[in-house]
A protein has these predicted regions:
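C-terminal accessory extensions appended to soluble enzyme cores
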Residues: 52-131
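Acidic/histidine-rich catalytic cores of soluble enzymes
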Residues: 1-47
Length: 131
């Protein structure tokens, strides 16, 4: 909410929604509300979001900072019926993307693709690996 009022409304820069960071600074909004507000700032450009999970939860070690990124992404990413690209932030990089596909996208040509060029396909829901 602060980014929308303080940045987007003043200078028009689109907001990149970050699922993990939203857990720590909700602005009084649900995940879906914050996501859709961020998506509304992109105009005619396909929106981009960031997705990561907590290393503390992954390792089940309370000594690890909750903000630290996990090696892999385990939960299915909720898009709430919207169309946007997702950048996966995970320590295992391409292996994290591969494992996500194996867990959630099996036998579905709408998986996560790695690299700068998008493959030609019907779906526009393509997730990118962050470099």
């Amino acid at each position: 909410k602060d980014l929308y009022e303080g940045i987007y409304k003043k200078i028009g820069i689109p907001i990149v929604f970050d699922y993990h960071h939203h857990q720590f600074c909700t602005g009084g909004m649900s995940e879906q509300e914050a996501l859709e507000m961020a998506l509304s700032t992109w105009g005619d450009i396909k929106p981009v979001t960031h997705y990561s999970e907590s290393r503390r939860d992954e390792q089940e070690d309370m000594r690890i900072r909750v903000q630290a990124h996990s090696d892999y992404v385990y939960d299915k990413i909720e898009m709430y019926g919207n169309d946007f690209d997702i950048m996966i932030e995970a320590k295992a990089k391409e292996l994290a993307v591969k494992r996500y596909n194996e867990l959630h996208i099996k036998n579905n040509n709408k998986g996560i693709y790695i690299g700068l060029k998008r493959p030609k396909m019907e779906s526009k829901n393509i997730l990118h690996q962050r470099y």
